[in-house]
Amino acid sequence: MTTNAGPLHPYWPQHLRLDNFVPNDRPTWHILAGLFSVTGVLVVTTWLLSGRAAVVPLGTWRRLSLCWFAVCGFIHLVIEGWFVLYYEDLLGDQAFLSQLWKEYAKGDSRYILGDNFTVCMETITACLWGPLSLWVVIAFLRQHPLRFILQLVVSVGQIYGDVLYFLTEHRDGFQHGELGHPLYFWFYFVFMNALWLVLPGVLVLDAVKHLTHAQSTLDAKATKAKSKKN
């Protein structure tokens, strides 16, 4: 990107020259309402499904965790998958998801600059954590023995990617957004991404707890069987 004396876009650094930029024709509230409406419908649908389709009854916490993984599957596969496919065309495209990314990029312009780390990180997220998030939901509904391992793998992967996401921007001096802006910095950049540190962190502890208990039970049975032989 080259510099431009008079920026005609809302992105940072303000000297960026974005010749192909086309402003969104949808207001911010419209974009956010669309995103959160779809997310809300998905949460309600997953909640109802987890109460009816599970092989064994699931508790409130487990059903809420499945709602989280369903939302993750949607965001990783659809929204981030869109970015992976069309990141080179976002600036001039007016499809809803392109406008969503142009709106989010006001808090992190790496998404409209084709930043190498961002593209690679989002590709891994869309291709791995998206499908695996949906597999977590199915695994818990079916009581699959891999369910807590899948939960652990996905959650650790999400935390790892999110930590790198924050640290790379920190090392760049937070130059890709307006530092301290209540919406673009604190809500888009900090809060929305911090969710993928806090919730996966809780789910990692949950998975470790159950896997540790299962291993302890197996070890106890093995010890008991060995003592009987002796």
Swiss-Prot record:
Biological processes, Gene Ontology terms: cholesterol biosynthetic process; cholesterol biosynthetic process via desmosterol; cholesterol biosynthetic process via lathosterol; cholesterol metabolic process; hemopoiesis; ossification involved in bone maturation
Protein name per UniProt: 3-beta-hydroxysteroid-Delta(8),Delta(7)-isomerase
EC number annotated for this UniProt entry: 5.3.3.5, 3.3.2.11
Listed GO CC annotations: cytoplasmic vesicle; endoplasmic reticulum; endoplasmic reticulum membrane; nuclear envelope; nuclear membrane
Catalysed reactions, as listed in the record: lathosterol = 5alpha-cholest-8-en-3beta-ol; zymosterol = 5alpha-cholesta-7,24-dien-3beta-ol; 5,6alpha-epoxy-5alpha-cholestan-3beta-ol + H2O = 5alpha-cholestane-3beta,5,6beta-triol; 5,6beta-epoxy-5beta-cholestan-3beta-ol + H2O = 5alpha-cholestane-3beta,5,6beta-triol
Domain annotation EXPERA: ranges: 61-204
UniProt KW keywords: Acetylation, Cataract, Cholesterol biosynthesis, Cholesterol metabolism, Cytoplasmic vesicle, Disease variant, Dwarfism, Endoplasmic reticulum, Hydrolase, Ichthyosis, Isomerase, Lipid biosynthesis, Lipid metabolism, Membrane, Nucleus, Steroid biosynthesis, Steroid metabolism, Sterol biosynthesis, Sterol metabolism, Transmembrane, Transmembrane helix
Cross-referenced PANTHER family: 3-BETA-HYDROXYSTEROID-DELTA(8),DELTA(7)-ISOMERASE (PTHR14207:SF0), STEROL ISOMERASE (PTHR14207)
Transmembrane helix as UniProt keyword: yes
Annotated organism of origin: Homo sapiens (Human)
Consequence of changing residue 121 to A: Reduces catalytic activity to less than 35% of wild-type
Effect of residue 47 to C: In MEND; patients have increased concentrations of plasma 8(9)-cholestenol, 8-dehydrocholesterol and 7-dehydrocholesterol; probable hypomorphic mutation
InterPro entries registered for this protein in UniProt: EBP, EXPERA
Modes of activity regulation: Cholestenol Delta-isomerase and cholesterol-5,6-epoxide hydrolase (ChEH) activities are inhibited by tamoxifen and the selective AEBS ligand (4-benzyl-phenoxy)-ethyl-N-pyrrolidine (PBPE). ChEH activity is inhibited by oleic acid.
Family per record: Belongs to the EBP family.
Keyword Electron transport listed: no
A Pfam family this chain is assigned to: EBP
Additional record remark: Binds to the phenylalkylamine calcium-ion antagonist emopamil, an anti-ischemic drug.
Disease: Chondrodysplasia punctata 2, X-linked dominant: A clinically and genetically heterogeneous disorder characterized by punctiform calcification of the bones. The key clinical features of CDPX2 are chondrodysplasia punctata, linear ichthyosis, cataracts and short stature. CDPX2 is a rare disorder of defective cholesterol biosynthesis, biochemically characterized by an increased amount of 8-dehydrocholesterol and cholest-8(9)-en-3-beta-ol in the plasma and tissues.
UniProt GO molecular function: C-8 sterol isomerase activity; cholestenol delta-isomerase activity; cholesterol-5,6-oxide hydrolase activity; identical protein binding; steroid Delta-isomerase activity
Consequence recorded when altering residue 80 to A: Reduces catalytic activity to less than 10% of wild-type
UniProt membrane topology term: Multi-pass membrane protein
Modified residues (N-acetylthreonine): 2
Function, as annotated: Isomerase that catalyzes the conversion of Delta(8)-sterols to their corresponding Delta(7)-isomers a catalytic step in the postlanosterol biosynthesis of cholesterol. Component of the microsomal antiestrogen binding site (AEBS), a multiproteic complex at the ER membrane that consists of an association between EBP and 7-dehydrocholesterol reductase/DHCR7. This complex is responsible for cholesterol-5,6-epoxide hydrolase (ChEH) activity, which consists in the hydration of cholesterol-5,6-epoxides (5,6-EC) into cholestane-3beta,5alpha,6beta-triol (CT). The precise role of each component of this complex has not been described yet.
Matches recorded under PROSITE patterns: EXPERA
Subcellular location: Endoplasmic reticulum membrane; Nucleus envelope; Cytoplasmic vesicle
Main location: endoplasmic reticulum
